[in-house]
Amino acid sequence: MTDKEKRLERQSRIRNFSIIAHIDHGKSTLADRILEKTSAITQREMKEQLLDSMDLERERGITIKLNSVQLKYKAKDGEEYIFHLIDTPGHVDFTYEVSRSLAACEGAILVVDAAQGIEAQTLANVYLALDNDLEILPVINKIDLPSAEPERVRQEVEDVIGLDASEAVLASAKAGIGIEEILEQIVEKVPAPTGDPEAPLKALIFDSLYDAYRGVVAYIRVVEGTVKPGQKIKMMATGKEFEVTEVGVFTPKATPTNELTVGDVGFLTASIKNVGDTRVGDTITSAANPAEEALPGYRKLNPMVYCGLYPIDTAKYNDLREALEKLELNDSSLQYEAETSQALGFGFRCGFLGMLHMEIIQERIEREFNIDLITTAPSVIYDVYMTDGEKVVVDNPSNMPDPQKIERVEEPYVKATMMVPNDYVGAVMELCQGKRGNFIDMQYLDANRVSIIYDMPLAEIVYEFFDQLKSSTKGYASFDYELIGYKPSKLVKMDIMLNGEKIDALSFIVHRDYAYERGKVIVEKLKELIPRQQFEVPVQAAIGQKIVARSTIKAMRKNVLAKCYGGDISRKRKLLEKQKEGKRRMKQVGSVEVPQEAFMAVLKMDDSPKKQ
């Protein structure tokens, strides 16, 4: 057999697939079982959620980063097949990670919980898989639960998604039931990769990470051609050229191989020192015989939420920059730029896909890079149209132009889809109305599950909406949102003043109808959180020049009369006058320290008034 025939024969036995599911429907457990079944790992190495390598992932029990692993499986037809399993996250903020994983596959296993049925996220991920023309294999998981209703869920998959579920495997990843059927279905139904191993090299970078010894490690899926160590490669987006030092696959440990050819999913190192040279979604081709055109990469993701990150110790500003550079390498949806604040010093304005993404990045910086952070209130991007016809894009409330010059302000709206049990429909609708939502549609999926659709301002969803939705439905609701565009709203910027000075990091943008109540709540909260000073401190909320709410932090009092026993009233009065004068002078020059809790208070408006 020639090299080419060998490669083509091997190619016909490759199956690339990923597992998609809503959070907690069991995809990491299923991945564990598949690894055991194909004996990719010994019992000794087995631990729960094997592919979730980040500590954070294991603690929270969620998958954040995608991971890939190569498995060998001896099927019933006697052939040995090569599987590439690419693990994907299930949370709404990480949809991008999912779309990257799916671009590297030909098939997807759709895991649906036999007790809970289809959730909002399941749908979102299925549509992504259909966009990528993948073969979808439905699997109904957790059939060993007492509350499992596999037949109802099978019907739901057919009705809601429109997939043929007659051959859906009934499985329990935990108990190891049905795993073999799943593997056999992968062999039969998932198509082998197409592509010519002799053609010019084309490989898609779907992830990358930085290794202190080897430089950048790129995770690639070879679409056409072959790549070997010693070969010169070129990045199509940047035009940079490198020499490959090592290629290999994950079994789950990184294992070097002689070459990667069509359909292989593995890694490549080429002494790439600069983090920016390997963009995720870029195409690698050979320098000597480059491909004509790049693979369709990923769409560049735009952040939805911005917030300021500042190191508590200002000397760590450069460490924070390095941390962000390294995180940006394998999380291309993170964006950041330097900014300064009078209250907090030097820091960065960072863009995230959503609140969970923001929390995860914050935690990763604090853990992996050991930098303590202060974060400012998250805000979305507003389009501000000026009276002179100019349009200004505002992602930081303190950059809001002067209200006199503003003609209108537009804010991003999202279409929010919530799947809720029947009993909680009223509570959810009330919550959405309170968040300035517009009711669009409501459908009954079956006797006790309802899908509710609202158009809502992204700014209202950004903070705590998900938590409030969960608590108003006892944790049963699931939620997914997509951006639909910008709409004009009556928005104003609210400044918080301490002792007559504006604190730039506490400013936020609010709807005019809610401004008074929001101002009142914040002023009261700050009054509790800011420590008392030697002098009286007024806390005010202002819109432009107009003060809408005020409260006063009382001064601490020293008893200056303690040393006067009895004595003349004029003597006492003199001491009190002197104290009063001292306090007045102090008030003119005194500055007030704002604790971190005060910044968080502006965000946590959970007791903000509901608009009737």
UniProtKB/Swiss-Prot annotation:
- The residues the record assigns to binding GTP are D24, H25, G26, K27, S28, T29, N141, K142, I143, D144
Gene Ontology terms describing biological process: positive regulation of translation
**Pfam families xrefs:** EFG_C (PF00679), GTP_EFTU (PF00009), GTP_EFTU_D2 (PF03144), LepA_C (PF06421)
Q: What class of enzyme is it?
A: hydrolase
What region holds the tr-type G domain?
Answer: 12-194
- InterPro entries from the entry? EF-4, EFG_III/V, EFG_V-like, EFTu-like_2, G_TR_CS, LepA_C_sf, LepA_CTD, LepA_IV
GO CC term (a single one):
plasma membrane
Q: For this protein, what reaction is catalysed?
A: GTP + H2O = GDP + phosphate + H(+)
UniProt KW Signal keyword: no
What does the record give under GO molecular function? Answer: GTP binding; GTPase activity; ribosome binding; translation elongation factor activity
List locations, semicolon-separated: Cell membrane
UniProt keywords (A-Z) are: Cell membrane, GTP-binding, Hydrolase, Membrane, Nucleotide-binding, Protein biosynthesis
| Membrane-topology descriptor | Peripheral membrane protein
Highest taxon listed in the record's lineage: Bacteria
| Described purpose of this protein according to its UniProt entry | Required for accurate and efficient protein synthesis under certain stress conditions. May act as a fidelity factor of the translation reaction, by catalyzing a one-codon backward translocation of tRNAs on improperly translocated ribosomes. Back-translocation proceeds from a post-translocation (POST) complex to a pre-translocation (PRE) complex, thus giving elongation factor G a second chance to translocate the tRNAs correctly. Binds to ribosomes in a GTP-dependent manner.
The record's comment on protein family reads: Belongs to the TRAFAC class translation factor GTPase superfamily. Classic translation factor GTPase family. LepA subfamily.
* Listed name of the protein: Elongation factor 4
From which source organism is this entry? Answer: Bacillus subtilis (strain 168)
The encoding gene: lepA
